[in-house]
């Protein structure tokens, strides 16, 4: 039956294709995996490239996906230690208010991160056996996440069309300089700037500083290393931005329920919340605990997949606060049980977050602001109390706060009373639930489901060998042509010459009139 279903999908879409995937770890992989599972269900052959140092991309997965593992000089433990070190530093050691220190910390992280992925990429593209196998496989499309550089180089080496699945790149630099998207700093907040769509003058100043930081540091320093590396591998001068700009389609994991209005291009599509789905029944014991809450309902608490534990002191403060709530609390927590854990709070190493948020008795969601969790809360219409830690989490919760669906607290400075008051407000003030439901209705009222949209455009690229007709001419222009500096210069030159000629003619006429007048006087 499954085979017949897959064959029917193949016939309806034209043909079954071969998809090569270059993934990113953590929540990025969870989103990518959702797309890949759907492609497999439609009969496509999906091959995922993973290094031997991969953290979450599991080669033992039995979902019908083929995994091609290549050896690398890094180890899984080293990669995990790298991410955990910087996660802890960016979460606990640096304040966003200290801009210069914050910039420097991100700069060091980006440089080390880039070095790690350059080494992994080198281990792949210089592996003749693996590359020969990939060439022979004749893939129809390369699906990649640009936050993990190398997919664009791989697509160029294999001469295959490239499709991106992306949440964001730092400062929107790739989207702007390679994808051609517009991000006017006057009204579009730069990602990681912690700003919303309505900015005061000083917030626009801050937004401009963030944009300049990413434009000049990230663009001028970090990418130049990849320019050299890609040129060496391809044997010809090329820029990394040029390779990124060859992406046929950008599947952006966002939507207007989270974003503020901004310009898009014909080859850019929002597919935010593609992993969201109707709630499924909970495990028996968990359902019993949820039902025991009565009319008060439950609160769901999760800080995502990357935060596995907290300090004992912080865990105890949180536990004592949660114990004061009349609601039952389901807390995703992997650490020592807090000494003052309330009877209303249950700890779990893993929770079916989507199913809990979709439960009829769920009242609020305590979240770190990761895009996956925020979209699940939007999907089910659940208001949030946000504790952002790093990256885009501050932005996501700033947007939700501006839209009236969340209260955001500072993880480092919040007191127990701040936390408790925020929870009581979100649960008891009906405006937060109303705003969350408004966003939920917006999310559901789309002409095509996000996952279906992602699948459609990947299959579209396979059917048509690309999507060149959607590519704006800006990609073929130099920077001075893009900004019409040559046209402005030409028009200024014409104006200058015309002005000069007019003045010259006027002076000649004036002199002739003057000379004629003098001659008449002499006569």
From Swiss-Prot:
Transmembrane regions: 487-503
Catalysed reaction, written as an equation: glucuronate acceptor + UDP-alpha-D-glucuronate = acceptor beta-D-glucuronoside + UDP + H(+)
Gene Ontology MF annotations: glucuronosyltransferase activity
Signal peptide span: 1-16
Tagged with keyword Hydrolase: no
Main location: membrane
Protein name (record): UDP-glucuronosyltransferase 2B16
Gene behind the chain: UGT2B16
């Amino acid at each position: 039956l499954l085979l017949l279903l897959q064959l029917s999908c193949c016939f309806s879409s034209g043909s079954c294709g071969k998809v090569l995937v270059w993934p990113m770890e953590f929540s990025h992989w969870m989103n990518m995996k959702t797309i890949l599972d759907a492609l497999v269900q439609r009969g496509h052959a999906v091959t995922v490239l993973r290094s031997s140092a991969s953290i979450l991309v599991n080669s033992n997965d039995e979902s019908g996906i083929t995994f091609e593992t290549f050896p690398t000089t890094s180890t899984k433990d080293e990669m995990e230690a790298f991410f955990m070190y910087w996660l802890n530093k960016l979460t606990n050691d640096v304040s966003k208010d200290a801009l210069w220190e914050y910039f420097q910390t991100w700069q060091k992280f980006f440089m080390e991160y880039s070095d790690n992925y350059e080494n992994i990429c080198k281990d792949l593209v210089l592996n003749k056996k693996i590359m020969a196998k990939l060439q022979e496989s004749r893939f129809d499309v390369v699906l990649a996440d640009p936050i993990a550089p190398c997919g664009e180089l791989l697509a160029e080496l294999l001469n295959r069309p490239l499709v991106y699945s992306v949440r964001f790149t730092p400062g929107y630099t790739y989207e702007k300089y390679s994808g051609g998207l517009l991000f006017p700093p006057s009204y579009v907040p730069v990602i990681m700037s912690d700003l919303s769509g309505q900015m005061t003058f000083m917030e626009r100043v801050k937004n401009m500083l963030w944009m300049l930081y990413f434009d000049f540091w990230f663009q001028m320093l970090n990418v130049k290393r990849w320019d050299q590396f890609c040129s060496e591998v391809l044997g010809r001068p090329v820029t990394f931005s040029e390779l990124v700009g060859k992406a046929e389609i950008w599947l952006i994991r966002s939507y207007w329920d989270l974003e503020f209005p901004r310009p898009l291009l014909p080859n850019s599509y929002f597919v935010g919340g593609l992993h969201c789905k109707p709630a499924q029944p909970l495990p028996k014991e968990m359902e019993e605990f949820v039902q025991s809450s009565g009319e008060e309902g439950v609160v769901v608490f999760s800080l995502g997949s990357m935060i596995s534990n907290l300090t004992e002191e912080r865990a105890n403060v949180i536990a004592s606060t949660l114990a004061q709530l009349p609601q039952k609390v389901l807390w995703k927590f992997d650490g020592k049980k807090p000494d003052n854990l309330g009877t209303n709070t249950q700890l779990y190493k893993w929770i079916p977050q989507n199913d809990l948020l979709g439960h009829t008795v769920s009242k609020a969601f305590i979240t770190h602001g990761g895009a996956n969790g925020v979209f699940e809360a939007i999907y089910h219409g659940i208001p949030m109390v946000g504790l952002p830690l790093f990256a885009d989490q501050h932005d996501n919760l700033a947007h939700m706060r501006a839209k009236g669906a969340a209260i955001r607290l500072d993880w480092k400075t919040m007191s127990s009373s701040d936390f408790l008051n925020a929870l009581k407000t979100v649960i008891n003030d009906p405006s937060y639930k109303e705003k969350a439901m408004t966003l939920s209705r917006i999310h559901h009222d789309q002409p095509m489901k996000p996952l279906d949209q992602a699948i459609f455009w990947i299959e579209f690229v396979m059917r048509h060998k690309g999507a060149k007709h959607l590519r704006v001419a800006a990609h073929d222009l130099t920077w001075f042509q893009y900004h019409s500096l040559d046209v402005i210069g030409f028009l200024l030159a014409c104006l200058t010459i015309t002005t000069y000629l007019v003045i010259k003619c006027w002076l000649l006429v004036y002199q002739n009139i003057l000379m004629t007048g003098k001659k008449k006087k002499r006569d």
